[in-house]
């Protein structure tokens, strides 16, 4: 067990210290960027190919990938790296924007993934009837400790706004959030609470501090266009500090940051017949389908 902890620490600490350069003092990333550019020069002999694969932005602005065989694969004689955009897909190939037609047997589409506009958000509705998708679209993806959102009582989720990482493992963050949510459930049960909802002013203050911390980060100022930034220009995906700092603030559920109503004070829910429940479910299903 002791050796396992040492092995974990030797992997964790070097990655964790990168956040100093990524989020707090970007100048500290210069040696790493120099090493990366030197690596490209050593791996890629062809000047034109080297030009294509050399980023024109600061290291860390986009997610850093570690690979021993990526550049050698691109340098193989049977590989062409085409950076022109695709203008058209034909029956047996693709046409790039420079007018060149290339026949292909298969097209692998690697267009990324939904982060700030996940399809699941459209099916979650708050106390005012607005969906989570509508709220995030209007204001940007904001939450409290990545687990709760103002206007959505009794809703907790994992890997929410500003819990992503650009330097180390997400597992540590997920474990931290699990501790927070489990403690929330136990607190609600222990105090016989009917509903909890994070206070809007608490959420606003939390996000204001996050955005202030992110203003000087490589992710915001590194000169690239990435999925880290939303259409409002805010970085609503990444945590701008050490992961152990996030674990500290999620160690216990902070009930005072929430509005709570005792279960005994909630109005009774009218009894529904099986037919009424079925009609409600069908209506909700039609709403989701229509969206």
Predicted feature locations:
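N-terminal FAD-binding dinucleotide-binding subdomain shared by FAD-dependent oxidases/monooxygenases
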Residues: 1-291
């Amino acid at each position: 067990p002791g050796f396992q902890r040492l092995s974990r620490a030797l992997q964790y600490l070097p990655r964790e210290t990168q956040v100093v350069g990524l989020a707090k003092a970007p100048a500290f990333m210069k040696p790493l960027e120099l090493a990366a550019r030197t690596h490209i020069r050593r791996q890629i002999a062809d000047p034109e190919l080297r030009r294509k694969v050399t980023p024109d932005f600061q290291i860390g602005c986009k997610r850093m990938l570690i690979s021993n065989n990526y550049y050698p694969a691109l340098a193989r004689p049977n590989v062409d790296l085409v950076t022109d955009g695709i203008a058209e897909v034909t029956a047996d190939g693709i046409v790039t924007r420079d007018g060149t037609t290339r026949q292909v047997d298969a097209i692998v589409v690697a267009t990324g993934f939904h982060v700030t506009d996940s399809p699941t958000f459209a099916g979650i509705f708050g106390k005012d009837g607005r969906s989570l998708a509508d709220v995030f679209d209007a204001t940007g993806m904001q939450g409290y400790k990545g687990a709760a959102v103002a206007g959505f009582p009794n809703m907790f989720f994992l890997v929410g706004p500003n819990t992503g990482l650009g330097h180390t493992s997400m597992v540590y963050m997920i474990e931290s959030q699990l501790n927070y949510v489990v403690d929330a459930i136990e607190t609600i049960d222990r105090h016989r609470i009917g509903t909890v909802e994070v206070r809007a002013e608490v959420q606003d203050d939390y996000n204001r501090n996050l955005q202030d911390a992110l203003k000087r980060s490589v992710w915001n100022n590194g000169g690239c266009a990435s999925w880290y930034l939303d259409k409002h220009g805010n970085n609503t995906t990444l945590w701008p500090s050490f992961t152990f700092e996030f674990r500290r603030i999620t160690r216990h559920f902070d009930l005072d940051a929430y509005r709570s109503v005792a279960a005994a004070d909630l109005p009774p829910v009218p009894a529904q017949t099986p037919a009424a429940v079925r009609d409600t479910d069908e209506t909700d299903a039609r709403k989701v389908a229509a969206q």
